[in-house]
């Protein structure tokens, strides 16, 4: 029975006032409380939730969770630090040598942190003059504007949209495809399941908890990762994890975490743990599939009705093709460190009951990262439960509000990314001189070091251009990409780099022109509440005026467009609040007749509008019901165990069906493990969103060790190396080195280390090879493409060694502004 809006809001209010937070959040969020007298508190949103903020004398003095957020995250403690951080970019700055010599500067000096303060007019003139030089002297192939990154929340102030629209009004450029989170998955899964899946709504948690008998979290840690979302997050999924914890305790469901480490999810749920050697998931899956086949446990009817290509995959599984090796449990046991009989029992368990497989993203962030997702889909198909309530496969239940039924309401649109119909750029040059207009995002360093080289990518040929200029806005490229010293060498090839941000990230430090954007808390905006659940619309009310000399991206790029006569076209003759109102009213119009939304003035004063939760839903249920009427988006319309299309590409590292490929480096007896015996896992952090909030001193004090990023290490490994909890440690390989703090924990097995990604790269100096003083794992990670198919990031293919740091450690360099010098 559907409830009225009045009853819905009444129930939400009651829950907000009385709901006890789950145990794993209580300790973190003792500060959280219902926001009494909310009229005294402004409302805004962030990736880590909606908040109320108290402002006195033009300064944020207190922050509380939004009263309808039942499970707020500790990350909101970092909001004040983000606004008032020592790392704030206060004024437009230009690198000293670039200001002297422009595009003829010594680019090896990038990163020496010497900048000259200039006025906004001077900075934007320099920016515009460089755009002119590039388009007049070279053309669109010389300008790189690939801007993959999380940006800040807010539909209007989406910084990437502003940059692409504004620069696009001047001329064309080279952009990127894919992203750093799901690069391999989002390429392989459309071939196999017909959609990217990694960003698709999944079976509702309610149904999983009701119908699943086995729930397998495979390299998935929702307790840690559900704290954040692309839009303003609701955190509703935590209520289902709390219910799941109770079901595990009552032995009503069998839950297993398959992982090299004991995750926060495994510890919170108190569920079973299946250790597996890092990077060996495909071998384990193949052995499970082999057991299902030889013991006649697989669903033949499902394979016949809903898949294609099983007969072409089977010879490989049985050792009759390719390497002539039978992929049985004995074979996998030597690779995975799981006993052969345990593998067989695991397969029988999966087949014996209703099983929901839930995969995380980490296993596709490695070399041959396409294979785990492809083979995982084959495994799910052999179980025959895809499209059943409580069964099948998911690639995203650790992310955002996936699994929370969508309300069905339309959400606000965004500031337009592209030019309007009929608009033309100042330089409408589409001649790329034979170079590619789009490259895979994770190959930017290679493209800089190897201009003119042609590579394979997803059935096409990509040719790198010799870029002269790059623009980054609202993203930290020196966090997400791999192999810092290689990046230093590559970025020296660029003549000019422009960065727009609110903090002095490493990306800004290695730039030439740096423009200070304001934080999302210094501007007005609007955002969806619940990236997938669509539970409402949040007003992002400006908390304080932009600090120092910062401006919104809208104002920055509007002023840039004024320099070439496109200001009015860029902003459509609307200011900030007119745009916010426009986006809201368009959303209101789209929801008319389905959901009541008040006029804008009423909405803005209240700060939010909420919608009821939608109806529970099962992913792929319609396909299962009628595979012809609801065909998948694959070439055949079915699940493709064998892909004729991929096979036709002729790639040696990604063939027509899923396979086990050895890695360039792998721990626990794999390649290069004799020299570098530790696998370095760069997991998503617990108390920040990638590199966002790393500048928060309040949050860093809760996890940093001697002011360094913590390196999680097994007690026996630490003891053997003479390391105790709290020591400084040097972690290193042939690619780089960093100083970190030892966090000894038995959640990590021998030979496995973790440095959380997003740690701000803080090199001792600008020179290639200099030590990172804080602990960015991508200082050491391997910069190679996943395969010729996706060419995605391979950060989790990374071996290192460690030793106790001896002597006086250098100070951390990354959390303050530049050395301001005079010209």
Swiss-Prot record:
Transmembrane segments: none annotated. It holds the Pfam family Molybdopterin_N. Keywords: Metal-binding, Molybdenum, Oxidoreductase, Periplasm, Signal. Its EC number is 1.7.2.3. Predicted to be exported by the Tat system. The position of the signal peptide cleavage has not been experimentally proven. It is found in: Periplasm. SUPFAM superfamilies: ADC-like (SSF50692), Formate dehydrogenase/DMSO reductase, domains 1-3 (SSF53706). Mo-bis(molybdopterin guanine dinucleotide) binds at residue 181. InterPro entries: Asp_de-COase-like_dom_sf, BisC, CT_DMSOR/BSOR/TMAOR, Molybdopterin_N, MoPterin_dinucl-bd_dom, Mopterin_OxRdtase, Mopterin_OxRdtase_prok_CS, Prok_Mopterin_Oxidored. It comes from the Bacteria. GO terms for cellular component: outer membrane-bounded periplasmic space. Binds 1 molybdenum-bis(molybdopterin guanine dinucleotide) (Mo-bis-MGD) cofactor per subunit. GO terms for molecular function: electron transfer activity; molybdenum ion binding; molybdopterin cofactor binding; trimethylamine-N-oxide reductase (cytochrome c) activity. Its main location: periplasm. Its cofactor is Mo-bis(molybdopterin guanine dinucleotide). Residues 1-32 form the signal peptide. It catalyses: trimethylamine + 2 Fe(III)-[cytochrome c] + H2O = trimethylamine N-oxide + 2 Fe(II)-[cytochrome c] + 3 H(+). One of its GO terms (biological process) is anaerobic respiration. Reduces trimethylamine-N-oxide (TMAO) into trimethylamine; an anaerobic reaction coupled to energy-yielding reactions. Belongs to the prokaryotic molybdopterin-containing oxidoreductase family. PANTHER family: TRIMETHYLAMINE-N-OXIDE REDUCTASE, TRIMETHYLAMINE-N-OXIDE REDUCTASE 1. This is Trimethylamine-N-oxide reductase. It comes from Pasteurella multocida (strain Pm70).
